[in-house]
From Swiss-Prot:
Negative regulator of class I heat shock genes (grpE-dnaK-dnaJ and groELS operons). Prevents heat-shock induction of these operons. It comes from Bacillus cereus (strain G9842). Belongs to the HrcA family. GO terms for biological process: negative regulation of DNA-templated transcription. Signal peptide: none annotated. This is Heat-inducible transcription repressor HrcA. Pfam families: HrcA (PF01628). Keywords: Repressor, Stress response, Transcription, Transcription regulation. Gene3D superfamilies: 3.30.450.40, Heat-inducible transcription repressor hrca homolog, domain 3, Winged helix-like DNA-binding domain superfamily/Winged helix DNA-binding domain. GO terms for molecular function: DNA binding.
Length: 338
């Protein structure tokens, strides 16, 4: 159990190192207003903290830096919530204020904004469409030969595609088709749509649409949408701006992993509750052993729909990143309920 004095010194060391990226010595601590102990006392307490494994020496300096154990203790016991600047809160809320909530568009923009606000790498795993349910479908004619089919799901995903309208299908046929589709398919899971259409809906449409065969061929292409989730990155190269990663050899495997993207699907797909912080070697990938990954999920009720994560050095601004993720996931979840 750490004493109050040790807790204060440990927190001050970590806060200072997060801001400066420079090892922290007793002289630096002695200049802090909140540290009122003698230099000898500070040195003794630092020696005890080092012996306990919370801080460690570096090869190039007499100062100390936090260990993974130190960061873990800091995150679990010493971290205080950080109030975000009002301008950032407004910027984030504006992103989610669109009248039509397009989940994939928001996911992509969220990754970009988060990377800019943190100068770390942001990763957003979009909703998996196979678990979405159809909310409604629209077919909007552009001219006599083409139309735009708009598919909206219960999670706010909007899929639009341009389709060719056969000459034998007129506007009244299109209108009848849309009415039947919305009446019969609203609430049906996206992964079941294709079978539902060709096992049940085609029979219903036969009684409504004059040019039945042409209309069915058009529908076949309309509902072929990708069902797997998409992953969006913001600030892929941001890690290179961190002092820890100026050695390109050290960071090469991490950059390769970020560039390939696929490995992050497995990392972000896991079920979790609330904010999760993985520090250094707590990450399963060896490429991330000098990094911290903070992730949070957005959901509707009990259903987890996607994940937002920030990847940065272990010397990460944990409090700020957690506050940002809490705001983003809250806004994302509220947007999906619209």
């Amino acid at each position: 159990m750490l004493t109050e004095r040790q807790l204060l010194i440990l927190q001050t060391i970590i806060d200072d190192f997060i801001g400066s990226a420079q090892p922290v010595g007793s002289r630096t601590l002695a200049k802090k207003d909140e540290i009122t102990f003698s230099s000898a006392t500070i040195r003794n307490e630092m020696a005890d903290l080092e012996e306990l494994g919370f801080i460690e020496k570096t090869h190039s300096s007499s100062g100390r830096v936090p260990s993974e154990k130190g960061y873990r203790f800091y995150v679990d016991h010493l971290l205080a919530p950080q109030n975000l600047p009002n301008a950032e809160i407004v910027q984030i809320k504006d992103l989610f204020a669109e009248r039509i909530f397009e989940a994939e568009k928001i996911a992509q923009q969220s990754a970009q904004i988060l990377s800019e606000l943190t100068n770390y790498t942001a990763i957003v795993l979009g909703p998996k469409l196979s678990t979405n349910k159809l909310k409604n479908v629209q077919i909007v004619p552009l001219d006599r030969q083409t139309a735009v089919a708009i598919i909206v799901t219960d999670t706010g995903h909007v899929q639009s595609k341009t389709i060719t309208v056969p000459e034998s299908v007129d506007l009244s046929d299109l209108e009848k088709m849309v009415n039947v589709l919305n009446e019969k398919l609203s609430g049906v899971p996206m992964e079941e749509l294709h079978n539902k259409i060709f096992k049940e809906i085609v029979t219903v449409l036969r009684g409504y649409v004059h040019n039945y065969d042409s209309a069915i061929r058009m529908l076949d292409g309309t509902f072929q949408v990708p069902l797997s989730e998409k992953i969006y990155f913001g600030g892929k190269a941001n890690m290179l701006s961190q002092p820890e990663f100026h050695d390109i050899q050290k960071v090469r495997s991490l950059l390769t992993m970020i560039d390939n993207e696929a490995e992050f699907y497995d990392i972000l797909r896991h079920k979790q509750v609330g904010i999760q912080v993985k520090i250094g070697r707590e990450n399963t990938s060896t490429a991330m052993e000098d990094c911290s990954l903070i992730s949070a999920t957005y959901s509707i009720g009990e259903e987890q729909l996607g994940t937002i994560a920030i990847l940065g050095p272990t010397r990460m601004q944990y409090s700020r990143v957690i506050s940002l993720l809490q705001l983003f996931t809250r806004q994302f979840t509220d947007g999906l309920k619209k």
